[in-house]
Amino acid sequence: MPSISIPADPTNPRQSIKAFPIVINSDGGEKGRLVKQLRTTYLNDLDTHEPLVTFINTYGFIYEQDRGNTIVGEDQLGKKREAVTAAMVTLGCGPNLPSLGNVLGQLREFQVTVRKTSSKAEEMVFEIVKYPRIFRGHTLIQKGLVCVSAEKFVKSPGKIQSGMDYLFIPTFLSVTYCPAAIKFQVPGPMLKMRSRYTQSLQLELMIRILCKPDSPLMKVHTPDKEGRGCLVSVWLHVCNIFKSGNKNGSEWQEYWMRKCANMQLEVSIADMWGPTIIIHARGHIPKSAKLFFGKGGWSCHPLHEVVPSVTKTLWSVGCEITKAKAIIQESSISLLVETTDIISPKVKISSKHRRFVKSNWGLFKKTKSLPNLTELE
């Protein structure tokens, strides 16, 4: 099967996301305090002609509170309850924040109530109770609440039970500055569309998870031959392209490989709606595929919509994109099983934003490895 390789440089910061080191303050007693931390990322080099916007993500813990209690500060909350589980609450896109000021100090004003519900699957309702004024222009703050998949946004949703009130208290704050043109997401229904009249363009990313040799992840994923963690293959649906011509065999393969190469695809990774893959088509986009890209040929694919289990791993473990391939398949499932994939490795990996730098903190290990951690600073 013909293939075209994509250049990759795992050392490039454009293919990584920096993670928060774990820092605990202790006064010599039994309890430890997990220090609040801020991570800022700048993607302004991707498009210097566009105004900047910011994406805010918070990572922290859900605490339980007896029914009937009023909302209390996190210091009092921590003394009464231990963390139930970890979670991610995404505030979404908002205006440029030229100065963050004492944003970590203002996180004490950030409180979110958590309710569990269900439709076709379990869901979580996050309602903003108190928030720092600096975030008042961001999507979730303006809406006031959001209902999301429990599996995608909560580490262990099975620990959230009836008869209790729960609060989310953020500990880690991620702020990403990026050009406004980048923030385009393909509507979900479009990504699900299949037709016998189109070819489907997929993107396969080989992601190296930078875990330790004794990590349980090594048993779940393929160990890296270089001894640097483990590898996972992630597929994204990029677009559909109408078929044209009446070519067969090698001529057909060459036609689609050339069409894919002409798009000049480039991939990056950044913390936008959580860990997010950014695709940029620098070349010619076929007319039938233009709806899958925004202004300037950009499209974003939040990984929690594609691989929730891997995404929750990336909350606390670093990763880097090592390879990227374009896969051209029949869009129709009945035709897909009768044909072979056309693989084009000519997908560029962004030289500056290819990595999530290895993480030294772990949201998922707190209650296990640090059972006395009940307060947040």
Curated annotation (Swiss-Prot):
The gene is M. Late-budding domains (L domains) are short sequence motifs essential for viral particle budding. They recruit proteins of the host ESCRT machinery (Endosomal Sorting Complex Required for Transport) or ESCRT-associated proteins. The matrix protein contains one L domain: a FPIV motif. GO terms for biological process: viral budding from plasma membrane; viral budding via host ESCRT complex. The M protein has a crucial role in virus assembly and interacts with the RNP complex as well as with the viral membrane. It comes from Parainfluenza virus 5 (strain W3) (PIV5). GO terms for cellular component: viral envelope. Belongs to the morbillivirus/respirovirus/rubulavirus M protein family. A motif (FPIV motif) lies at residues 20-23. The keyword Nucleotidyltransferase does not apply. This is Matrix protein.
